């Protein structure tokens, strides 16, 4: 049983209501510059610099000597990219030992890239300093063995610019950018937003209308596809949209695990950005590398359906805990799947074969009291 540490950041057990529990701290707001506008910045006593830059002439903070600099083609060729889970200690901080083990498992299982701090990795529950630290840690420890793609997208163009600058500065190979969510913008606004971040480095655009509330129209993607740093699109709309793009030579990764086999082999997708590969990286590699395999796809569909029975990453967090590879700690607002679903997962593992899953421990059904839910961290 995982017990919460009696500190200022207490873990909260499932079923126990904390009176007046506080929400997670807000994400650190990032801006292009904390200083006054550059146009009014004085250099020397009483003199304006001849090289003063106005806000209309903003220069991206980039370097040709960035660690692990990779080509856009080096990103376009990736077939299996795992949207990796972020594990936690009982007080809600990152469990880096468990995280390192997860990344090593992905490398050994044949994944070619990882998304750090994406939806699956709960980047939306991180402060920006946590987010960039985890990207940097992944690059420093594993960047020579796997492509590190940092989720530095935001619904604020300002934050997306600053986070991408920092992500590339610490060595990430590419950025993942979602379209601005909640405060949705126009078609012209979408192009303007991506126009600001594409100069930073290789970029994958992520279209997931079920989460953002806005579908990125094909006209926008087609316009952006001419940009040198545009690597491709993680597309969640479906096969018809995938084929629309691949017919035009645009690189596409399926964002839907249950569609990725057909997207890859029937509709021209390059590969998948996967949640399921956190659990069975070797089988997902086979699905993406070894040609059409309807039998394997059919075998994995019950697992994929189970994983998304509640919004991602609830299922994945529950599964990895029951496999014994991460602590059963959830940052709120996430909570584990029901006991019925936890029991069903054990049956799915037995049907596919425990040897195909990550970790070495026997899969087991965790009790409600085994889980720790964190509100303050």
UniProtKB/Swiss-Prot annotation:
Keyword list, A-Z: Allosteric enzyme, Amino-acid biosynthesis, Chloroplast, Diaminopimelate biosynthesis, Lyase, Lysine biosynthesis, Plastid, Schiff base, Transit peptide
Site positions per UniProt: Part of a proton relay during catalysis: 119, 182
Pfam family, one: DHDPS
InterPro entries given in the database record: Aldolase_TIM, DapA, DapA-like, Schiff_base-form_aldolases_AS, Schiff_base-form_aldolases_CS
Compartmental location: Plastid, Chloroplast
Amino-acid positions noted as binding pyruvate in the UniProt annotation, renumbered to this chain: 120, 273
Active site annotation, chain numbering: 206, 234
Pathway: Amino-acid biosynthesis; L-lysine biosynthesis via DAP pathway; (S)-tetrahydrodipicolinate from L-aspartate: step 3/4
Annotated organelle transit peptide span: 1-51
Purpose: Catalyzes the condensation of (S)-aspartate-beta-semialdehyde [(S)-ASA] and pyruvate to 4-hydroxy-tetrahydrodipicolinate (HTPA).
Family as reported in the entry's similarity comment: Belongs to the DapA family.
Family matches, as PANTHER family: 4-HYDROXY-TETRAHYDRODIPICOLINATE SYNTHASE 2, CHLOROPLASTIC, DIHYDRODIPICOLINATE SYNTHASE
Protein name, as recorded: 4-hydroxy-tetrahydrodipicolinate synthase 2, chloroplastic
């Amino acid at each position: 049983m995982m017990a919460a540490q009696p500190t200022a950041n207490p873990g909260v057990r499932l079923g126990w209501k904390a009176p007046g529990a506080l929400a997670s701290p807000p994400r650190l707001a990032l801006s292009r510059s904390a200083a006054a506008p550059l146009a009014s910045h004085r250099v020397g006593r009483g003199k304006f610099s001849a090289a003063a830059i106005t806000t209309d002439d903003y220069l991206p903070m980039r370097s040709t000597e960035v660690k692990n600099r990779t080509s856009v083609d080096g990103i376009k060729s990736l077939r299996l990219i795992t949207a990796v889970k972020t594990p936690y200690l009982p007080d809600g901080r990152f469990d880096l030992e468990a995280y390192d083990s997860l990344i090593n498992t992905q490398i050994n299982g044949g994944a070619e890239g990882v998304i750090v701090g994406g939806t699956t990795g709960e980047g939306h529950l991180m402060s920006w300093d946590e987010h960039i630290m985890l990207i940097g840690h992944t690059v420093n420890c594993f960047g020579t063995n796997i492509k590190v793609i940092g989720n530095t997208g935001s619904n604020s163009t300002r934050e997306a610019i600053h986070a991408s600058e920092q992500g590339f500065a610490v060595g990430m190979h590419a950025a993942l950018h979602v379209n601005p969510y909640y405060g949705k913008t126009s078609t012209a606004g979408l192009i303007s937003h991506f126009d600001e971040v594409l100069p930073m480095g290789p970029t994958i655009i992520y279209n997931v209308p079920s989460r953002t509330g806005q579908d990125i129209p094909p006209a926008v993607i087609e316009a952006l596809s001419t940009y040198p740093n545009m690597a491709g699109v993680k597309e969640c709309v479906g096969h018809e949209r995938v084929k629309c793009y691949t017919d035009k030579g645009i690189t596409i990764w399926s964002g839907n695990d249950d569609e990725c086999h057909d997207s890859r082999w029937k509709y021209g997708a390059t590969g998948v950005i996967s949640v399921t590969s956190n659990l069975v990286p070797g089988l997902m590699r086979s699905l993406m590398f070894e040609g059409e395999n309807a039998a394997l796809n059919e075998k994995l569909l019950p697992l994929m359906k189970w994983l998304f029975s509640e919004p991602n990453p609830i299922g994945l967090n529950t599964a990895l805990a029951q496999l014994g590879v991460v602590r059963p700690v959830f940052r709120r607002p996430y909570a584990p799947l029901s006991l019925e679903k936890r029991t069903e997962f054990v049956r799915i593992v037995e049907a596919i074969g425990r040897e195909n899953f990550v970790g070495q421990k026997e899969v087991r059904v965790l009790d409600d009291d085994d889980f720790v839910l964190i509100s303050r961290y």
